[in-house]
Swiss-Prot record:
Family statement drawn from the similarity comment of this UniProt entry: Belongs to the CNF-like-inhibitor family.
Keyword Disulfide bond: yes
InterPro entries in the record: CNF-like_PLA2_Inhibitor, LY6_UPA_recep-like, PLipase_A2_inh_N, Snake_toxin-like_sf
Name recorded for this polypeptide: Phospholipase A2 inhibitor gamma subunit B
This protein's UniProt keywords: Disulfide bond, Phospholipase A2 inhibitor, Secreted
Pfam families: PLA2_inh, UPAR_LY6
Function of the molecule: Strongly inhibits its own venom PLA2 and all other PLA2s tested including Elapid, Crotalid and Viperid venom PLA2s, as well as honeybee PLA2s.
Length: 181
């Protein structure tokens, strides 16, 4: 299987073609929006992937009350990829859903200072990630925040194994109502 590979701001990217690894059986296109109210940043990404994650086409997470990351994706193979329109994200602001989680984000560290985050829209899980050895990008990562069940399922399927030598520990627990914390 060959797939286009690229990442760029906006809705289109200039890609090159890559032969996927043996365990990768689909091409994936992500449309991602990072919202730091009132500003939002959109980018597109194309890569090889595994078809067992295709049903998890919408994921969302918030590590901070003013920061939300959401991503819509489509999967395709062969000629279908040439005609399939890119995934479309709804540009709506999800309102708080009455749940909350600890939230924080730290690069180059496995610890970060937590604060409570109000979950939004479909986010009903608390996600905690620690990772190390992200190649040349950074040595460590610590992340906590609200997340959709679909994002937790993606982590359960170890979707990051397309990255070389990445060690990631993650845990998802149900988000709690605001009054109970």
């Amino acid at each position: 299987l060959e797939c286009e590979i690229c990442t760029a701001p906006g809705l289109e990217c200039n890609s090159w073609t890559k032969t996927c690894d043996a365990n990768q059986d689909t091409c994936v296109t992500f449309q991602t929006e990072v919202i730091k109210a009132p500003v939002s940043f959109t980018f597109i990404s194309k890569s090889c992937g595994t078809s067992d994650t295709c049903a998890l086409n919408y994921v969302q997470t918030s590590p901070h009350n003013k920061l939300t990351h959401k991503s819509q994706r489509t999967c395709c193979t062969g000629e279908e990829c040439k005609t399939l329109p890119p995934p479309v994200l709804e540009h709506k602001v999800n309102q708080p859903d009455g749940l909350q989680c600890p939230g924080c984000f730290g690069l180059s560290t496995k610890d970060c200072t937590e604060h409570l985050v109000s979950c939004r829209g479909p986010e009903n899980q608390c996600l905690s990630i620690t990772g190390k050895e992200f190649g040349f990008i950074f040595r460590a990562l610590s992340y906590k925040g609200c997340a959709t069940e679909s994002l937790c399922s993606l982590f359960e399927k170890r979707f990051w194994n397309v990255l070389e030598d990445v060690e990631v520990d993650f845990k998802c627990t149900p988000a709690l109502p605001k009054s109970s914390q």
